[in-house]
Amino acid sequence: MDKVELEFYFFMKGQAGSFTTNLFKTIMSADFGNQYKLSFGFPDEVSVVQKYKNEDGYWENLLNKFDNPESV
């Protein structure tokens, strides 16, 4: 699991810091055009949110990687 995925995990669990929380909330609420603009400064964070929104099973796989690291 990379650093951004770990930050996203903590965000989703309500345990992220204020900057990370506000960043992910902003990315998640942005339309495609604004996500594109945000990706210039935060490419990995935007990528994780897009995977979460568009890839079936992404969140479940992320949970599995965090909760069962030996199984990955």
Name each model-derived stretch:
Residues M1-A30:
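N-terminal acidic leader/helix
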Residues F10, I27, F42, F66-D67:
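Generic low-complexity, intrinsically disordered sequence content enriched
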Residues M28-E60:
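Short, charge-rich amphipathic interface segments used for partner binding and complex assembly
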Residues G57-V72:
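Long acidic/polar interaction regions in large eukaryotic complex-forming proteins
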